[in-house]
Regions:
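Amphipathic alpha-helical segments used for helix-helix packing
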Residues: 92-119
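Alpha-helical structural segments
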Residues: 11-18, 36, 53-73, 89, ...
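Helix-turn-helix
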Residues: 19-52
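Hydrophobic alpha-helical connector segments
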Residues: 71-101
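Short hydrophobic clusters on alpha-helical segments that form packing/core surfaces
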Residues: 8, 12-20, 66, 98, ...
């Protein structure tokens, strides 16, 4: 994504976060978002279909960040010897990711879409653990 698009998406994101601090997501309009972001409505619609598409996009970006942290902290060799240390390192990295994105995570968890976000996050965590971390363990049941 080019720099201008990233800058515009960040402005939209920051505007949405600021508005979500003031009121519930379902009460926020696209007009309010574009006014706060200082962009045109047309620019908003170049990036998103509607505010729900925007929220879905932000949720997916957050889930991808968490997945990347988890996958980048799985040792490729000497898995058994490093497993305990790697779990610690992975948790530390997930907590860093949370710290860097705590405002968004807090707003996503308390928004009217929190059940959707939590389900997506749970599904992604389950996939990473069962398919990437423990792919050879059959019948591994997780309760996340």
């Amino acid at each position: 994504m080019d720099r201008r698009k990233r800058k515009t998406r960040k402005a939209i994101f920051d505007a949405c976060v600021a508005l979500m601090k003031e009121k519930e997501f379902q009460n926020i309009t696209v007009n309010e978002i574009v006014e706060r972001a200082d962009i045109n409505r047309g620019t908003f619609y170049l990036h998103f279909v509607d505010k729900y598409d925007m929220m879905n996009s932000f949720e997916n970006e957050m889930i991808e960040k968490i997945e990347d942290v988890m996958l980048n902290n799985i040792p490729k060799k000497q898995f058994e010897e490093l497993f305990i240390q790697s779990r610690y390192d992975t948790v530390v990295e997930i907590l860093k990711c949370y710290e860097q994105n705590k405002e968004l995570l807090h707003l996503l968890m308390r928004s009217s879409h929190s059940a959707s976000f939590q389900a997506k996050l749970r599904d992604k965590l389950e996939f990473v653990v069962t398919e990437k971390i423990f792919p050879n363990f059959e019948n591994l049941e997780l309760q996340i």
